[in-house]
Amino acid sequence: MHKYDVVVVGGGHAGCEAATAAARLGASTLLITHKISTIGEMSCNPAIGGVAKGVVVREVDALDGIMGRAIDRASIHSVVLNGSRGAAVWGPRAQADRKLYKKAIQEIILNYNNLTVKEESVDDFLIESDSNGESYIKAVITDSGERILTSRVVLTTGTFLRGVIHIGEQTTPSGRIGDKPAIELANTLKKYDFKLGRLRTGTPPRLDRGTINWSVLQEQVGDNPPTPFSYLTEKINQPQVSCFITHTNEHTHRVIRENLHRSASSYLDNVIAPRYCPSIETKVKKFAEKNNHQIFLEPEGIDDNTIYPNGISNSLPIEVQYEMIKSIKGLENAEILRPGYAVEYDYIDPRELFHTLETKKVKGLYFAGQINGTTGYEEAAGQGIIAGINAALSLSQKSFVLHRTDSYIGVMIDDLVTKGITEPYRLFTSRAEYRLAIRSDNADRRLTQKGYDISLVSHERYSVLQGKLKSIKQLEEKLESLTITPEQLRSYGIKISYDGIRKTALDLLGYPNIDWNKLREIWPELNMGSSVSYLHNAKAPLPVIQVADTGIQYLNDDGMDAVDTEKNVDSSVMCWNNTITDSIAKNEIYEAVAIEAKYKPYLVRQEADMKFLQEEVNTQIPTNFNYSQIKGLSTEVIEKLQSIKPATIGIAKQIQGITPAAIVSILVYLRNKKTKIAANSA
């Protein structure tokens, strides 16, 4: 009978991060998966990252996770979403070559120290109770009846728990097309009294590249040079490809409307789908006034003929999918290689978990990924690494918890275990009240030291961080040594407060309209070095919460983050001296120093605003309060608040999907209304 310190069930994005994290901490780890050949499979879209999601990938990488390095070995189209806005909303995203990504993950997993991989299914657990009645894991039981002894299990089942695929009226028990579901394991969880719910998601049809008329489509070129995800990657080596854009039209919508009754969405109304990744059927129904919807045609590989049409996920019958596709510009002759489908599956109530992702019912049992009600590769990876870390650390009675103040992973896990979910959970910057501090550019500076302190992070990664921190300090000290008076600044066309106080170059860099080129004009000794690019024209950080105004103004009304793929680049920024080593990208150092300088005053205000929120938790909300009269609240927020009718701000904060921005907007509205009433009665 075999015995392992940690057993991870499931070889998806959560499982791979959990298994490698536990192994890095020295735990003898077993990864059990249905098929070794599908480890690292990108089941839905062939891309990693995005707004908020890209930050999570960087955070996983900062903890020595594997997703960032794998996507860097597979990236074929890279873009920084929101690149022309403040760094707090930058969203690195990379289109992947599916084969290269899977190959990269498998090469890492199958050659990892302390990690064994086994091809089998887990159907049951051996759970015992101690004298206090506390249940704990003793073993996992496979479908062949084998017992594998372990005291720590991480369950990362994805969409496989009682998974069912729907294509029109046809249904097939499956967790992913071509793969069987985990029926017995779902029954086991039910047997041990875990509260199960049902969710669904979907995927679009895959198209044949050679049957698409590319000449009539809008080309979307990626960033040049492409931006790596991993802090250990110097550059992306794969050839880069373009994506293309087309749109649905009235004919497309008519085809969909006439066949809605044949879609799985018509009989799965009680099974909630992702709000922010809706099917084309949902878009046509919910946004009937829209004449078209955008579709991104994304290549699935450099030498792969498969095209992923992002934006038309559906579960219509195959013949209807053909009719729909052929109504779209450029796709008139397109052939479908694989139909789109919906998949419904079980999830557990994440409120049954601690912040370590250990279950409250069974000691030593951890859940990570879509089983917790989340959606997305990145969210799964973020949970997986935390579950794997804690499974290993708990063997010596230790734990590792990230917080809302230090990471998006911390925001996500706190949301899940305290608020639960009512629909598939997806990360947005609007969910993070400390988003000005937890950005994509500083994940290593936030988390790598924490990982190193628990022996999770390699010496190589830690050395890279130390070199980077040293270079940042050197540059900041250089800038602080250069001073100038407000009077002298006027000769350079810079007008600031005429207070007679000398300003350092670092002070000036914090001003919205002062960049590196302006500093070089003032101080020629900041001479040109090797050419590097710097996002110096990116907009200054937008104002953080203003409690005297109307709440947070820089979040979208629909609760999602705006996507802006434009990035302003200046390739002629200087390097002030040669002490910044060649092994550290000089543009990273300049970027880090400038961002910190520009965000410094806003971070101070952010702290004050968060303190304000904490102090106002007992503020009463009128019973029949009309939330729709508050500008800036999303439809989701209004619906939930009108339904639940929270009595206080503190209760409203605990509702799943209610963002910090929404809470501030409500507080400001109530306070302004109270002030008006007082003024009128005076």
From Swiss-Prot:
Keywords (A to Z) from UniProt: Cytoplasm, FAD, Flavoprotein, NAD, tRNA processing
Compartments reported by the entry: Cytoplasm
SUPFAM superfamilies: FAD/NAD(P)-binding domain
Cofactor(s) listed: FAD
Annotated GO biological process: tRNA methylation; tRNA wobble uridine modification
Pfam families linked: GIDA (PF01134), GIDA_C_1st (PF21680), SAM_GIDA_C (PF13932)
Oligomeric and partner information: Homodimer. Heterotetramer of two MnmE and two MnmG subunits.
Protein name: tRNA uridine 5-carboxymethylaminomethyl modification enzyme MnmG
